[in-house]
A protein has these predicted regions:
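Alpha-amylase-like alpha-glycosidases and glucanotransferases acting on alpha-linked glucans and related
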Residues: 2-182
């Protein structure tokens, strides 16, 4: 685990007998909010610690798992999921969308070396800006907006964005509507 004080002795939350999912014990006593949960493959013992989603401003979102959007296959899988939803629902709202804007995704999950991190333990995963831009060349939300326009054009996309990103989301990323819940 990222911190030696973390322990994962609670109930297995997975419905799959092959996989164990465990929240950090302090979640239950409400004395801490861990940045990760534990995933165990019961078939081979492979253990991984998966980060919770987090905007770096307060406690992690313990009901989420952070995806690695540096991986093109992750971005594509999420976009396909959004397109599938758009075929069923003509309005889609993206919660905390600003956390996936490139500058904030890097700040939170792959901070530039020497800058520290807003999420504890992430500074060891630092990536310089040039490398980050090469790995993640196009804004994720621009990809989403363009694909929705091409494949499900009657869909209204609504994004939660703050940190002074509202105009950027509309003018640069093409999001249809933006709201600031802060």
């Amino acid at each position: 685990p990222p911190f030696p004080s973390y322990s994962f002795n609670g109930e297995n939350l997975s419905s799959d007998e092959n996989i164990g999912i465990y929240l950090e014990d302090h979640y239950y006593s409400q004395t801490d909010a861990a940045v990760v949960f534990k995933r165990v493959d019961n078939r081979n013992g492979d253990t991984r610690f998966i980060y919770h989603g987090n905007d770096g401003t307060s406690m992690p979102w313990n009901d989420t798992a952070q995806l690695n959007y540096l991986m093109p296959e992750v971005r594509e899988a999420v976009i396909k999921t959004i397109i599938g939803l758009a075929k069923q629902f003509r309005i889609i709202r993206f919660d905390a969308a600003m956390t996936l804007a490139k500058k904030h995704f890097q700040r939170l999950w792959f901070p530039q070396p020497g800058t520290g991190s807003d999420i504890a333990s992430r500074s060891i995963h630092g990536v310089d800006k040039a490398e980050f831009d090469q790995i993640f060349p196009v804004e994720f939300w621009r990809e989403v907006v363009d694909r929705i326009a091409a494949e499900v054009p009657d869909t209204l996309l609504l994004a939660e964005a703050f940190w002074m990103m509202e105009g950027y989301f509309v003018r640069t990323l093409g999001m249809h509507r933006v709201y600031n819940s802060a």
